Amino acid sequence: MPYERDCLDNDVRLRAQNLRTHEINLAPYVPGATLRADIIAKYPDGRYKVFDFTAPNFIKGVISYKEFAWHYGHTYDNDDQLDDHNANTFNNVTLANSGSTNPPRDITYPETVMIVLNGNFNIAQCRAFPVNQYGLTHKDWRLSRNNSPDPIHNCQWTPIGCYSNFFVMKFNQREGLRFILPACSDSAYNQYNSGTLAEIIWETVKHKTVKWFTGERQAINWFTQKNLAYPDSANFIASRAEANYIGNGNFSDPSRYY
């Protein structure tokens, strides 16, 4: 009978796993779901520094050029002397090989910054752009504006899977990064109503975590553990955010607790 043929699959565990996978892949689209943005700084010697932001509704902020410095936060580095270089310079230069005439290379600041968005972001409205060491879009503050003349926006973001996007930019040691990353919302729900807007602002709390990695392999392992999208330096998608059938939607996955 057709009914009997349809019921040959009695793998209850697989059915449960499929339901779990479906639940995870729809969860980021629920109103109030968490957004997760990762700003990944790659340094000339192959080290990585990741700024991990989580919040509902929107993520906005700025990372100063001082925060991009690898040694930022150490006791010998402080914000009182903005124009001073790190006193322990030997920790932040690479010396040329023996016999080479190349000068030492400063590895304090990143040469590449990648932005990875995970969640139901409104990509058409997401913007990110460099600012100078004083947070300005022009060296003359009187000509500085709220947005850069050419921010990363809309179709410049490259999609990864269901709900992740990324962009890669070259960087300068005296630049910071400003980003404005809103979530998608129901068009019938007016976020700009005064009461609604006040509630959204009140409920939106941004959390930042900073991770240091000595190489890309460590970075890939962390992104994979946390179920975050990550395209590696060869533009290969090394990790995806959506759940699949190989384990990152598993009921017994311990990484979701840490």
From Swiss-Prot:
InterPro entries, from UniProt? Answer: CPV_Polyhedrin
Q: Which UniProt keywords apply?
A: Viral occlusion body
Example of a GO cellular component annotation carried by this entry: viral occlusion body
Q: Does the keyword Iron apply?
A: no
Q: Give the protein's biological function.
A: Major component of the virus occlusion bodies, which are large proteinaceous structures (polyhedra), that protect the virus from the outside environment for extended periods until they are ingested by insect larvae.
Q: How does it assemble?
A: Forms crystal-like bodies by self-assembly.
Task: State the name under which the record lists this protein.
Answer: Polyhedrin
> What organism, scientifically named, is this protein from?
Choristoneura fumiferana cypovirus (CfCPV)
